[in-house]
Amino acid sequence: GHFGIDIQCPRNTAVSAVLDGTIVSAGYTIDYGYVVYIQHSNNYLSVYKYNSGILKNIGDKVSGGEKTAVTGWEDGKSSKQSCVAEFQLWHMGQSLDPEKYITF
């Protein structure tokens, strides 16, 4: 299923952490391009998919608003000028609707 929201954005847009946290996974996947997972306090986890590059490493501490990745993964669905970034928010293993918590 689809557990997050898709955000249309220009290529090479910086992807920022939504809250302070620690990078717990960062790498390339064949289905989602470069993906970053950030563990936050109180058992929240944010996930950033369809990136063309990653700016942080596993174990790095990040602040809310800090750049963690860059959009623009070539998935065959994106035009050359724009792309899709997927954002997910999880709490204790349950997916949340990000738009209830964050204004995009």
Question: Which residue ranges define each predicted feature?
Answer:
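Small beta-strand-rich domains/subdomains or short beta-sheet motifs embedded
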Residues: Q8, A14-V18, Y48-K49, G59-V62
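A generic structural motif
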Residues: R11, G27-I30, S52-L55, G72, ...
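Zn2+-dependent peptidoglycan hydrolase active-site motif and core
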Residues: A17-I54
